[in-house]
């Protein structure tokens, strides 16, 4: 199956936890539980549908799909893209030509009268000139042109497809039209992905997203697919839906609960506002400093869909209740080693339900546009596969444990290392560019070009769990803990050939950039001065990075001035 086809890759909202990048792994998990191959009509349950990409995969596989999400925007999007087949368009809109004409009509509407403008009034600047906006006094979630586009299209949808008209055709026309607008509104937004904050100026400091942000909002023809089986979408709490007993048993249930503290109702409040279109006033009141009191103007009713999975004290119990309530032969769970519920607890809860297997993938964690001086930037997203008709086997759980441990060790090989720390935990063989350590009576040898980066061994899967744990601990204790430590290591290595000096100097700008945040301001200027002083000792090599260092400095000044 081609996972990059339009239905599985287009018109999918940008989303924290969006499973588009994990879709090959989820597809593999589905194939693993179907040893006789995919067959039409398999009952598939997706209670945390979100962007809907996994349910789209299930529909594409010709499964019977029951999807659910209690956020209004997700419910509308998934109802449109799951419940409507491509072949339904002529019966809903009379013809494909009529739908294209409707989209042309939406895209060429005049601006709404001032009293009917909502997004343009509260969530966008008063001027079309992006260089004259003031993020302190007005919200900058959209350009004025795109805010006006949202207003006029959304107002027109309510006018020609009134919400109180409950006929099938009217509701389907309405849902698909709103879904197309929601995708555009989620895409052409002046944010890093969520609506809790907007960039201070369009495109942020780097201006690297201006093309996306400034591109005009226009509704495109929907990417739909065909299925011979029904796809139904609910809007409910996942556990409540599973516990009602109204749903028959499923062949496969796919669970993707929230991993972290980010609540979807607050993160995507503007999408809910556009979906509901209740136009709750969001006054632009200023405080005594002349700055907006309520910068994001988040809907107060977001707490109605507040998820227990986003709280450390509640997440584990919520997950356990859900797993116990699900009636399915196979349960596929995607979660993260960086999630609120520790991996061991997730594994144990799953093992109480049945036999457990695992698939893993390295996945960059969500950082909301910022990097940390000291945090690792990689974690492991994994998929656990539960066979609820078998009891958990010790050997299966041992494989699960080892798989995660191997991945954790491999991720450490992506870090940079302190040569001094390495010498405390390994024997350094400088003549042969390697480090060695005796682990479980065997001498382990790891290649390293410079004692700053390490090459993973090709035999890592053959190590015992005990050996992996010891290796993990030694590598963890030897790794650079901060970007400052990395910069120091780089500078300590600037004593080799011209080629080597050039190689290390080129690492400096991106490493220095990680310190260009207010909380590291003092450290940034200390290291900036040290970096600039390198020009005196290495003038020709420094010329290779001079412009990049200046760009980092300029970016830092912009951040610090705000």
Model-derived features: where do they sit?
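Class I S-adenosyl-L-methionine-dependent methyltransferase module
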Residues: 64, 68-220, 265-310, 317
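Conserved Class I SAM-dependent methyltransferase catalytic core
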Residues: 299-362
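Short conserved loop adjoining the S-adenosyl-L-methionine
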Residues: 240-247
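Conserved proline-anchored active-site loop of SAM-dependent methyltransferases
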Residues: 44-58, 67-72, 247-267, 334
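S-adenosyl-L-methionine
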Residues: 1-43, 53-61, 75-77, 84, ...
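Flexible, glycine-/basic-rich loop-and-beta segments that form/coincide
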Residues: 90, 378-416
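Class I S-adenosyl-L-methionine
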Residues: 343-391
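Conserved acidic residues
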Residues: 237
């Amino acid at each position: 199956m081609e996972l990059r086809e339009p239905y599985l890759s287009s018109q999918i909202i940008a989303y924290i936890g969006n499973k588009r990048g994990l879709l090959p792994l989820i597809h593999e998990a589905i194939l693993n539980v179907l040893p006789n191959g995919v067959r039409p009509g398999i009952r598939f349950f997706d209670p945390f549908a979100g962007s809907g990409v996994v349910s789209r995969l299930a529909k594409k596989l010709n499964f019977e799909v029951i999807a659910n999400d209690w956020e209004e925007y997700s419910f509308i999007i998934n109802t449109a893209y799951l419940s409507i087949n491509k072949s339904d368009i002529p019966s809903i809109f009379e013809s494909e030509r009529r739908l294209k004409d409707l989209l042309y009509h939406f895209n060429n509407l005049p601006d709404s009268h001032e009293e009917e403008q909502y997004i343009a009034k509260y969530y966008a600047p008063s001027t079309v000139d992006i260089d004259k906006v003031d993020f302190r006094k007005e919200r900058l979630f959209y350009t004025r042109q795109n805010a006006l586009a949202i207003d006029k299209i959304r107002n027109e949808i309510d006018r020609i497809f009134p919400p109180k008209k409950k006929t099938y055709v009217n509701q389907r026309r309405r849902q698909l039209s709103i879904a197309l607008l929601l995708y555009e509104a989620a895409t052409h937004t002046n944010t890093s992905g969520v609506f809790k904050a907007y960039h201070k100026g369009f495109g942020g400091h780097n201006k690297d997203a201006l093309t996306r942000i400034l591109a005009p909002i226009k509704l495109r023809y929907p990417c739909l697919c065909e299925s011979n089986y029904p796809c139904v979408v609910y809007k409910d709490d996942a556990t409540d839906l599973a516990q009602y007993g109204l749903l028959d048993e499923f062949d496969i249930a796919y669970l993707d609960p929230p991993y972290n503290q980010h609540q979807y109702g607050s993160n995507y409040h503007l999408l809910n506002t556009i979906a509901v279109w209740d136009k709750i006033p969001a006054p632009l009141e200023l405080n005594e400093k002349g700055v907006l009191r309520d910068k994001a103007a988040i809907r107060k009713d977001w707490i109605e869909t507040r998820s227990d999975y986003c709280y450390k004290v509640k997440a584990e119990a919520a997950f356990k209740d859900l797993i116990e309530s699900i009636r399915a032969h196979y349960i596929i769970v995607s979660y993260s080693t960086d999630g609120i519920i520790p991996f061991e607890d997730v594994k144990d809860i799953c093992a109480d339900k049945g036999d457990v297997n695992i698939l893993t993938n390295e996945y960059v964690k969500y950082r909301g546009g910022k990097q940390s001086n000291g945090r690792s930037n990689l974690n492991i997203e994994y998929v656990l596969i539960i066979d609820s008709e078998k009891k958990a086997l010790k050997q299966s759980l041992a494989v699960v444990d080892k798989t995660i441990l191997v991945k954790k060790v491999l991720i450490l090989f992506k870090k940079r290392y302190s040569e001094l720390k390495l010498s405390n935990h390994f024997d350094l063989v400088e003549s042969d560019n390697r480090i060695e350590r005796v682990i479980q009576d065997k001498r382990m040898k790891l290649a390293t070009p410079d004692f700053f980066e390490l090459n993973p061994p090709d035999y890592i899967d053959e190590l015992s769990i005990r050996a992996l744990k010891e290796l993990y601990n030694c590598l963890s204790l030897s790794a650079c803990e901060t970007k400052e430590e990395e910069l120091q290591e780089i500078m300590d290595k600037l004593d080799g050939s011209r080629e080597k000096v050039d190689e290390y100097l080129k690492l400096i700008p991106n490493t220095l950039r990680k310190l260009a945040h207010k909380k590291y301001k003092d450290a940034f200027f200390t290291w900036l001065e040290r970096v600039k002083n390198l020009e005196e000792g290495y003038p020709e090599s420094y010329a290779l990075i001079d412009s990049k260092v200046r760009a980092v400095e300029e970016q830092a000044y912009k951040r610090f001035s705000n």
